[in-house]
């Protein structure tokens, strides 16, 4: 379970970085060269999703819970936005959904 969650976390970071770098280019005038590491990060994201032994749709659904939490962590650390009680509640619900799916995929 810990290995799966850690892999999902790294996967989410790759996806967020792969989307954030083009955002910097488009919104903040960063160099177009940032698109190269963005593409590499997104390619790594896709590859990491293939490392799970469950069916792809089940992996994507479970990954979503960790992605939500990672995005909120990014919101706090990178964007400097204080999380609200709604953010925390949403993260808890998302993680519960992920946990149910991951526990279930080992039993089917």
From Swiss-Prot:
Note the superkingdom of the native organism: Bacteria
Q: How does it sit in the membrane?
A: Multi-pass membrane protein
InterPro entries given in the database record: UPF0060
Q: Cytoplasmic side of the membrane: what ranges?
A: 27-30, 82-84
Q: What is its main location?
A: membrane
What NCBIfam families does the record point to?
Answer: PRK02237.1
Q: Do you know which Pfam families this protein is assigned to?
A: UPF0060
Q: Mind listing the UniProt keywords for this protein, alphabetically?
A: Cell inner membrane, Cell membrane, Membrane, Transmembrane, Transmembrane helix
**Which family does the similarity line name?**
Belongs to the UPF0060 family.
Entries under PANTHER family matching the protein: UPF0060 MEMBRANE PROTEIN YNFA
Q: In its UniProt entry, what is this protein called?
A: UPF0060 membrane protein YnfA
Q: Which organism is it from?
A: Salmonella schwarzengrund (strain CVM19633)
GO CC terms in record: plasma membrane
Residues annotated as transmembrane: 6-26, 31-51, 61-81, 85-105
Where does this protein reside within or beyond the cell? Answer: Cell inner membrane
Q: Which residues lie on this side of the membrane: Periplasmic?
A: 1-5, 52-60, 106-108
Q: Which residues form a coiled coil?
A: none
